[in-house]
Amino acid sequence: MDIFGILTMVGGLALFLFGMNAMGQGLEKLSGSRLERILEKMTSNPFKAIMLGALVTAVIQSSSATTVMVVGFVNSGIMRLSQAIGVIMGANIGTTMTSWLLSLTGIQGESIFMQLLKPTSFTPILAIIGIFFIMMSKSSKKKDIGTILMGFAILMFGMETMSSAVAPLADNEQFKSILTMFSNPVLGVIAGAVLTAVIQSSSASVGILQAMCATGAVTYSTALPIIMGQNIGTCVTALLSAIGANKNAKRAALVHLYFNLIGTIVFMVLFYIINAIFPFEFFEQSANQAGIAIMHSVFNIFATIIWLPFMKLLEKLAYISVRDKKDDNAPKNEFQILDPRFLATPSVALEQCKSIAVRMADCARDTLKLSMGLMSKYNDRDVEIVNENEEKVDVYEDKLGSYLLQLGSKNLTPGDSQTVNMLLHCISDFERISDHAVNISECAKEMHTKGLSFSKKAIEEIHIFNGALNEILDTAITAFEHGDIEQAKSVEPLEEVIDNLRTEIRNRHVKRLRKGKCTIEMGFVLTDLITNYERVADHCSNIAVCMIQIHDNSFDTHSYISDLKATNNEEFRKKFTVFSEKYMLPDAKKTD
């Protein structure tokens, strides 16, 4: 093979790997987080776990990606090690799907039907459809379909290019002698493992082996140990991802290694013993692409079947390899679910971000309600809790904000990108709500320390204000947690009512001050209090408006709110009237 042949082969390999990656990314985006959510929740039954592991891997076209995802689930405590074992087994079966797709390149025959099955016949059509969807369609779903079709076409073209480039090696004696050397089981396993460890994809390395079949020099005796080694080499990705993870995550990575390593040993020992007694006629024949796919599938199904009754033993072996220590019972860190491993699968990472954001929202709401209660029933311990919770919310914002920024730099779908932006905006509002909770607790502390108290009329007005603030807080956060757009639309009318309440309470206080029914000192406290209340309502409005804008693809906040409050907006006016009547202050003459 001359330099141009080598360049053609390497170029074909580059196209092959790029196509595989593009197709996998497109499939992952199209499926969204549905498969991952199922994987996360439906793994209690071993058979379900195996099927789901196979399904997810067949879709995202990478057993390594599935296993890394599982390591992340185990590391964050979402999945137990016993659940992970079945998924890992299934991932090994699912990864064989790629080799079956690639086996289409080896189809022989001159009939019209056989010609249509050849990739050279249909991949140009798929490429045309794919590029049309990518360039012309505005729908993100159609763009993802286009990416899948283009990825598949490039994958097949790369495979054909590699096969054509290596075909001249059929008459190269040096090449044949190298392949003969790999028919030695030990050397073949090592070669397959090293190749797969380097490119970190067993599907890709099996594809390369299938391309080499075009030379006619690859026999099944050579291919078998290489395929066995490829299954071992794919474990490197999971082992690397487990570095720095907790002990259970390390055990999950080792389960993947033991499954393939011990499965390879058992399979090869049995195969070579049987072959020695009853020689297989096909073993010294030239391998083809379909034969490689069959061998790859048979091994992974065989390994799953022999391990299925011994899943507990596999789990125990992992525990023996990574032992617990006496000081390993440290409390679980809730931020473990923001695992960097999930960033490789953005839809999974986004689900974890939503989970943390919900906890942050609940913490901010509880903190504010606790601080509001201090105005009527003060105690120092609750003030401490308010301050502790505010610091906790700050940590939430720091950890979650940093993770979201990392996630935002990934290749996200338009929908996921909008969700990341919404979360970044909302967590800032949650943090500010907790800050106002501290301010309110300081008002309560000042009143308690100085022995101050509001007038009876002011207490009645604040009680009504409390009710309105509690409702807008619950409405905004419940809408956020459930993604309820209709509920979010109730926030802005109530926020306007709260603005009016603040103005009216302040005006009434000025009147009482003039009549000597209230002191200037209490006026400062009241002003601080209702200002903090009104600011909290503003942040609730920000949360709801952000949700609605993301949903409606409208990003001009000022114009949106202006349109919302327009006199011809019947829905807004109707809700505003209902809230105004519900939170109406007592008659002014009676309060003076």
For the regions a language model picked out, list residue spans one by one.
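Membrane-embedded alpha-helical segments of transport systems
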Residues: 59-66, 85-102, 119-124, 155, ...
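Helix-loop-helix hairpins and the membrane-proximal interhelical loops
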Residues: 1-46, 145-194, 212-215
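Short helix-coil transition sites and intra-membrane helix breaks within transmembrane domains
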Residues: 24-28, 57-65, 166-167, 195-204, ...
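Membrane-interfacial helix-loop connectors
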Residues: 69-91, 99-121, 159, 196-233, ...
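Hydrophobic core segments of alpha-helical transmembrane domains in multi-pass membrane transport
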Residues: 8-22, 53-57, 125-137, 150-162, ...
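Cytosolic, long alpha-helical scaffolding segments
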Residues: 79, 105, 218, 244-250, ...
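Hydrophobic alpha-helical transmembrane segments of multi-pass integral membrane proteins
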Residues: 42-69, 185-208
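Interfacial loop-to-helix junctions that mark the boundaries of transmembrane helices
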Residues: 1-7, 109-121, 175-181, 221, ...
